[in-house]
Amino acid sequence: MPLAALHDDAPRRPRIALTLLAAAALALAQAGAHAATDKLLLTGGVTSVDGAAGGGLTPWAVIGSNATEGEFGVAATASVVSTRNYTMQVRGLLLAYDDRYEVTFAQQDFATEATGRALGLPGLHLRMDILGAKVRLLGDAVLESDSWVPQVAAGVEVKDIDAGGLKPTLQALGAHTHGVDYYASATKLFLAQGLLVNGTLRMTKANQNGLLGFGGTGHDTYKLEPEFSVAWLANRKLAFGAEYRRKPDNLNPSLLGAGLKEDDWYDIFAAWAPTRNVSVTIAYVQLGHIVPAVATNKQAGGYASAQFAF
């Protein structure tokens, strides 16, 4: 199927949401940089690639930042994922209130590198904006750690993808450039054992998390996909864990046969919080096949993220 020979140089859409969140984040950080907090290190998770508090690949029921009951909090993050054929950079902002409400904004910049060149689109970047919201519904992972009731939260992620010269191909495949994910998460902290477990159910139409649009011809309904995380708190500043995220396979088969087959994601990570306001995460990630019609190898690689929270 011929691809439109367009260049990925269209003007970026105005980042109104990011500007508002950045202004609010700066004000909150200045106001609360020296405020005391009772929140235990790392129990608020880190920031996922979609912007929500949790692990690197999946949201948890925890609320991000250092805010506790009655407090406002803010967190900013920058991440990079590098695999055999692709590189993705992520930046995000998170606002929280009362350890119950969370609003996030993330931007993903996915460099297609050799795959873009093979498709006749050299220099192609897939850019996605993600506006998210989460609310804690019941439980408290820390204060009620002696109870069997987990902390439970529900969230939404509104995603818009700027596919540049790939947009005509996505349209031919029946994929949309706008989508909404809905999820519910349950997080249980076994404080005495230093063990945290999380389960998430996500309703989604996303192809490769939305980077290849949403849905496809004959596959335009929501799928319910499970996600799991486990983390061991080795001490108050260091955690090790793993995540698994099942994903739909809407573009397999397609006009390209199995050339857009999609696999599940997983990672093995280590998170370190040298101070109350800073955390660093590194991980080995396995993202499976991404456009195997061109990039035939599975996309394994590294993930690194830095988060600043107040």
Give the positions of each predicted feature:
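Cleavable N-terminal export/targeting peptides
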Residues: M1-V46
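Short alpha-helical segments used as structural interaction elements across diverse proteins
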Residues: A10-R12, A27, A133, S185, ...
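Transmembrane beta-barrel domains of Gram-negative outer membranes and organellar outer membranes
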Residues: A35-G174, H178-Y182, T187-L195, N235-L238, ...
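Surface-exposed beta-strand-turn/loop segments characteristic
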Residues: E113, Q208-G210, F214
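Short, surface-exposed, charged loop/turn segments at secondary-structure junctions
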Residues: P168-T177, L201-M203, L212-T221
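A structural motif
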Residues: L191-K205
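Outer membrane beta-barrel transmembrane domains
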Residues: L212-D220, L224-F310
